[in-house]
Regions:
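Short, solvent-exposed secondary-structure boundary/capping segments
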Residues: 54-65
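Charge/polar-rich, low-complexity and marginally structured segments
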Residues: 85-192
Length: 192
C-alpha cells in the first residue's frame, strides 16, 4: 500500500473562528414559520411560503415551501432534512458585525494553486450556504483583484458570492442591496 501525500495549509485563526461561528447558525428541524426568511445553500435567501404535508410512497412528509427571492423559484424542503440540506435562519445582527470584521481582515495568503483548484475550493465554500464561508470567497477575490485583473471565471465567481452575501446582509440589516454593496466595495477600496 502506497502512502498518500496530503497537502496541509495553515488557516489564520480568524478564519477558524469565523467558521465556528458560522456553524452556530444551523437550526434544528421545524424551527421556521410561515413568512420567515431563510437561507438555502447555493440559492440564497428565500421566504417560507407554507408548510405542507404530502404523501409520498405511502408516507406522509411535511415540507417547507420556500420561495427563493432572487429567482422566484419555489423549493420544497422536507422538515426532517433541514439540517442535511443546510437550511438556516438569516444572519443575526451580531453575526453581521463578525462578517464585516472578517471582510476587513485582508491579511490573507492566497496559495499559489491553479485557478481550477481555487475555483473548486471557492464553490465548495459557496455551496455550504454559510455566510462566513461566502464572505471569505468575496474577501479573497477582492484582495486578489487589488493585485491583478481577475479572469472571467474569477469575476463570475466574485459576482455570485457577492450577490449571495449582499442579499443576506441587506435582509439581516433591514437595508437595501445597493447600500450594502457600496459598504463592501468601500472596505476593499479603502487604503489598508
Amino acid at each position: 500500500m502506497r502512502a498518500q501525500k496530503i497537502a496541509v495549509r495553515s488557516v489564520p485563526f480568524s478564519r477558524v473562528q469565523s467558521v465556528n461561528k458560522a456553524t452556530q447558525t444551523e437550526t434544528k428541524p421545524a424551527e421556521f414559520s410561515v413568512g420567515q426568511k431563510v437561507v438555502y445553500p447555493g440559492h440564497g435567501v428565500g421566504q417560507v411560503q407554507t408548510i405542507e404535508t404530502k404523501e409520498i410512497a405511502g408516507t406522509k412528509i411535511s415540507f417547507y415551501m420556500i420561495r427563493i427571492l432572487e429567482s422566484d423559484v419555489t423549493v420544497m424542503v422536507p422538515i426532517n432534512k433541514v439540517a442535511s440540506v443546510g437550511l438556516r435562519a438569516v444572519v443575526s445582527s451580531k453575526e453581521i458585525e463578525d462578517v464585516y470584521s472578517m471582510l476587513r481582515d485582508k491579511k490573507i495568503v492566497v496559495e499559489q494553486t491553479t485557478w481550477n483548484r481555487r475555483y473548486r475550493e471557492y464553490m465548495d465554500k459557496i455551496k455550504t450556504g454559510l455566510i462566513f464561508e461566502i464572505g471569505t470567497v468575496v474577501r479573497d477575490l477582492c484582495v486578489i483583484r487589488q493585485d491583478k485583473v481577475l479572469s472571467f471565471g474569477e469575476k463570475k465567481m466574485l459576482e455570485l458570492a457577492k450577490g449571495l452575501l449582499v442579499k443576506e446582509l441587506a435582509i439581516g440589516e433591514g437595508s437595501d442591496e445597493p447600500t450594502i454593496e457600496a459598504q463592501i466595495e468601500q472596505i476593499f477600496t479603502a487604503v489598508a
